[in-house]
Amino acid sequence: MIAFHMVWSALLASLLLLLLAPSASPVDAFSPPEASLTGGQSLSKRSLFDPSCTGVFDRQLLRRLGRVCDDCFNVFREPNVAMECRSNCYNNPVFRQCMEYLLPAHLHDEYRLAVQMVGK
């Protein structure tokens, strides 16, 4: 029960930080709905990212997915979260749990689609 309250407090604190600094929002939760994750695509410098991501190479998309993992690590401070969240090009249970904890429900489908796009 105490662990739940600690996690809940950490989550609330991170949400408060997001509200205070919307321009630095890692998940762009305050962006308008028409702002899509699937904007322009680049085909250069693929080696900068995980080689297991063999789908569409979109830096902005990969950055947003990676930011979910970074924020999840910052909330829970578990060493394995950062690596497991990115494994299999974000197509794993840890990423899905992080997404559910950190993102508003209306963005879940958009991020699931993004994972499918980069991991094909």
Curated annotation (Swiss-Prot):
GO molecular function, one term: neuropeptide hormone activity
Keywords: Amidation, Carbohydrate metabolism, Cleavage on pair of basic residues, Disulfide bond, Glucose metabolism, Hormone, Neuropeptide, Secreted, Signal
Any one of the GO BP annotations: glucose metabolic process
The UniProt record lists the keyword Disulfide bond: yes
Family statement: Belongs to the arthropod CHH/MIH/GIH/VIH hormone family.
InterPro entries recorded: Crust_neurhormone_CS (IPR018251), Crust_neurohorm (IPR031098), Crust_neurohorm_sf (IPR035957), Hyperglycemic (IPR001166), Hyperglycemic1 (IPR000346)
Described function: Hormone found in the sinus gland of isopods and decapods which controls the blood sugar level. Has a secretagogue action over the amylase released from the midgut gland. May act as a stress hormone and may be involved in the control of molting and reproduction.
Name of the protein this chain belongs to: Crustacean hyperglycemic hormones 2
Annotated signal peptide: 1-27
Subcellular localization, as worded in the UniProt entry: Secreted
Cysteines paired by S-S bonds: C53-C89, C69-C85, C72-C98
Pfam family, one: Crust_neurohorm
GO annotation, cellular component aspect: extracellular region
Modified residues (Valine amide): V118
Gene3D superfamilies recorded: Crustacean CHH/MIH/GIH neurohormone
Keyword Coiled coil listed: no
Superkingdom of origin organism: Eukaryota
